[in-house]
Regions:
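Sec-dependent N-terminal signal peptides
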Residues: 5-13
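His/Asp/Glu-rich mid-to-C-terminal helical/loop segments that flank catalytic regions of hydrolases
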Residues: 389-411
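Active-site/substrate-binding loop(s) of hydrolase catalytic cores
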Residues: 187-205, 210-357, 373, 380-387
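A mature extracytoplasmic/lumenal domain signature
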Residues: 102, 114, 162-164, 206-207, ...
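Short glycine-rich, acidic/polar surface loops and turns
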Residues: 360-379
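Extended acidic/polar, glycine-enriched regions
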Residues: 137-183, 189
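Extreme N-terminal flexible tails
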Residues: 16-154
């Protein structure tokens, strides 16, 4: 039976808080002012291979997170890096990630070619795929509208990426470490499968008994290149445990449900934005045409019905050009009125010199922040981190914003 098109939910009202629960497993569709077609569209898969040139310089995309659609020798010291999107139209987030080496030590100029799209991400390098360093700004230039960068190559492999690689392997390692450190409070499992059969993980943070607790929902990595948003989510979750006394009190009344990597297919394939269905997942929160949004909305709905939770807040972690909070025009009619202003104001108090930028918008598009309000009357916020925001500040801000959220919700 296709629950997506059937609306036979029974609304159950709790006596103590007037909270509505949907007595069904699958999330119903929603109507928004702007209709967006999210039925699957064809995509182009890159060919996974090792590229060899006549000059002894080679490159490969044979690893998760890679994007290298072609590698062309212009001459013995200049090479073209081609990255094309999975399909179009698409947001201009040209992702690249590859390994490169040379048979002799040499300086090589790499020309980044994205077709009609402009360069966005400042290159990072690594010798092991785990520890990253941004290149010196003196190494990078622009010639005839194309970005070029100079690298010293040897027989040893150099990884060159748009942003630090954070794939499913890194995610599992972090979840295992978090669970080991907080085994009574952290649980994780598999909510379902992606279009290609990869695991969609969930994390359940709180005491084992989740019934009748207020619920916070966290999302990340709907868009594969948005690694800084993933870092902010990690820091936010780490911040939930920074103060043991606050955490103990908070988790007696709240649980936190996390979907830390919503688009693992896109992450593994080095996509610019979309899933394997060729769709921006953050436009599929109306009819759930894509398996990732369908699995996660069904999981949330089943969890909240089973445990009789009141969803109070949804935060979706993303990356963009600079830090910003995308909010709804007002949260006065939400289940936690005026939370947004309290939270934003409190964030400033612990981050010297930081002025949060807030961009409110109406409930027009089928995006996650709107879905939280439409379905649960919960506050929905898109928590955006800049591409180049310093990583230590991402960590500091993530932990601080978690602490202030906990304090406000405990009032």
């Amino acid at each position: 039976m296709n629950y997506k098109y059937l609306l036979f939910a029974t609304l159950i009202l709790t006596s103590c808080r007037g909270v509505q629960y949907l007595a069904r497993q699958a999330a119903p569709g929603a109507t928004y002012a702007e209709t967006i077609d999210t039925k699957s569209k064809p995509i182009t898969f890159q060919t996974k291979k090792i590229y060899h040139t006549p000059f002894g310089v080679s490159a490969t995309n044979q690893f998760d997170g890679a994007r290298l659609c072609d590698f062309i020798a212009i001459n013995d010291s200049t090479y073209r890096i081609v990255s094309t999107p999975e399909n179009e139209p698409i947001n201009p987030s040209p992702w690249y990630a590859f390994k490169i080496w040379s048979n002799i030590p040499r300086e090589a100029t790499l020309v980044f070619d994205y077709g009609d799209f402009a360069h966005r991400y400042f290159p990072k390098t690594s010798s092991d795929g785990h520890h990253w360093m941004a290149i010196d700004s003196a190494q990078i230039d622009s010639i005839d509208g194309k970005t070029t960068a100079r690298f010293f190559l040897t027989k040893d492999t150099t990884w060159i990426v748009a942003q630090e690689l954070y794939t499913e392997a890194e995610l599992r390692s972090w979840m295992n470490a978090l669970q080991a450190a907080h085994h009574q409070t952290v649980d994780y499992g598999i909510a379902g499968k992606t279009k290609l059969g990869r695991d969609l993980y969930y994390m359940d943070l709180g005491e084992k008994k989740a019934k009748h607790k207020d619920l916070i929902i966290l999302l990340s990595r709907q868009h594969p290149p948005e690694v800084t948003g993933q870092f902010a989510l990690k820091a936010f979750i780490d911040g939930l445990f920074d103060s043991p006394a606050l955490a103990e009190a908070f988790f007696k009344r709240h649980n936190v449900l996390v979907f830390p990597m919503m688009n693992p297919d896109g992450v593994a394939l080095g996509h610019w934005r979309h899933n394997v269905g060729g769709i921006d997942l953050n436009r599929d929160w109306a009819v759930y045409n894509q398996p990732e949004t369908r699995v996660i909305t069904d999981f949330i709905n089943h969890y909240t019905y089973k445990n009789r939770n009141r969803v109070v807040l949804g935060l979706d972690f993303h990356s963009t050009w600079s830090d910003v909070y995308y909010t709804n025009l007002s949260d006065s009619a939400s289940v936690i009125p005026n939370f947004t202003k309290q939270w934003i104001d409190s964030i400033k108090s612990g981050l010297e010199g930081y002025q949060p930028r807030v961009a409110p918008s109406a409930l027009r598009q089928p995006v996650s922040k709107n879905w939280f309000y439409v379905h649960f009357k919960a506050v929905g916020i898109t928590y955006e981190i800049g591409d180049d925001t310093p990583r230590d500040f991402i960590d500091k801000k993530g932990r601080w914003t978690a602490k202030k959220m906990m304090e406000i919700l405990m009032e």
